[in-house]
Amino acid sequence: MRSIDPNTLELEEKVVTINRVAKVVKGGRRFRFAALVVVGDKNGHVGFGMGKAQEVPEAIRKAVEDAKKNLIEVPIVNTTIPHQIVGRFGAGRVFLKPASEGTGVIAGGPVRAVLELAGIGDVLSKSLGSSNPINMVRATITGLTNLKRAEEVAKLRGKSVEELLG
C-alpha cells in the first residue's frame, strides 16, 4: 500500500474525543489530555490520530499530525461503499452497508465522523460490541481499508466484472 501525501490534499479535521488521563505519582496525580482526531478530504481519503499533552490544543495538534501520517484511500461507488463489510478492532465491531442515494450517513458519533470525512454520502452502519470511541474509529478504518471495488475483485479472481456480478 502506498503512502498518501497529506500536503496535496485539502484536509478537514474533526475532534472525536478529548479525555483527561492521570498519572499517579507520590505527590498526587499528574493530569494530561488525550485527543482522538479524524482527518479527511471528503473525497476518498481519511485517517485518524491520537495525541497526548498537558494542554488540550497541543494534544489536538499532535493528534492531527499523527492522523496525517495514517491516511487511507477509500473506494467510493457513486456516493456509497462498494459492498457491505464488518470492521473489527478489539471488542469493537462496526457493520457498514451500502445505501441508496439520498439516504445520508446513518451512523453514531465516532463512526459518523470517519464516514463523513471520507466523503461517503450514503451508508448504513451499526456499532456492535465495544462503544469505546478509539475502538469504534479503528474498527471503521479497518472496515474501510478492506473494501474493494468490483474491478479489483474480478482482477484478483481472473474474471471479468460481468462474470463476477452475474
Curated annotation (Swiss-Prot):
A Pfam match: Ribosomal_S5_C
Key words, A-Z: Ribonucleoprotein, Ribosomal protein, RNA-binding, rRNA-binding
Boundaries of every S5 DRBM domain copy: 11-74
GO cellular component: small ribosomal subunit
GO biological process, one term: translation
Segments forming a coiled coil: none
Gene Ontology molecular function: rRNA binding; structural constituent of ribosome
Membrane spanning stretches: none
PROSITE patterns: RIBOSOMAL_S5 (PS00585), S5_DSRBD (PS50881)
InterPro entries: Ribosomal_Su5_D2-typ_SF, Ribosomal_uS5, Ribosomal_uS5_bac-type, Ribosomal_uS5_C, Ribosomal_uS5_N, Ribosomal_uS5_N_CS, Ribsml_uS5_D2-typ_fold_subgr
Domain of life: Bacteria
Membership in a protein family: Belongs to the universal ribosomal protein uS5 family.
Functional note: With S4 and S12 plays an important role in translational accuracy.
UniProt free text on domains: The N-terminal domain interacts with the head of the 30S subunit; the C-terminal domain interacts with the body and contacts protein S4. The interaction surface between S4 and S5 is involved in control of translational fidelity.
Subunit structure: Part of the 30S ribosomal subunit. Contacts proteins S4 and S8.
PANTHER family: MITOCHONDRIAL RIBOSOMAL PROTEIN S5
Designated name of the protein: Small ribosomal subunit protein uS5
